[in-house]
Amino acid sequence: MSAVCVDGCATGINPRTLTTELPHLKRGGVHAGLVTTAALETTEVAVGAINQWWRAARLHPDQVRVVTRVPELRAAAAEGVFAAVIHFQGSVPLGTDLELVDAFHRLGLRVMQLTYNYAGPVGDGCLEERDAGLTRFGRQVVERMQQI
């Protein structure tokens, strides 16, 4: 397989809609997606959402696989299995705990949008008039993300 189509924000698919959504994605040529597991949710809710994807992958290994590396994504696509890339649309689940960057990474998180519309511990979102950018904590989060 030479080309892989990845939905950069697959908000329409979740573990509960797998059986109905996957046929549409396959017909559309989508092999993988950044599956949103959190945006403004608490740490606990985000962990639960990630766990639902791992559970779905365990229950339906012929349909979905949680991937954490590019070779895994390519292999899943070549096998006709949807590759789910764990994604946050905001860093709210981190709270102000830098160690949670590592914890979520261990759970499979590979893409995290830093802010989602409003100001938070990491920085200002796009709807904030002051446009203050990243906070000190936000810069630490970015640095840690680059290290892992």
Task: Map each language-model feature to its residues.
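N-terminal hydrophobic targeting/anchoring segments and the immediately downstream early-domain regions
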Residues: 1-136, 140
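Substrate-binding cleft of carbohydrate-active enzyme catalytic domains
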Residues: 141-148
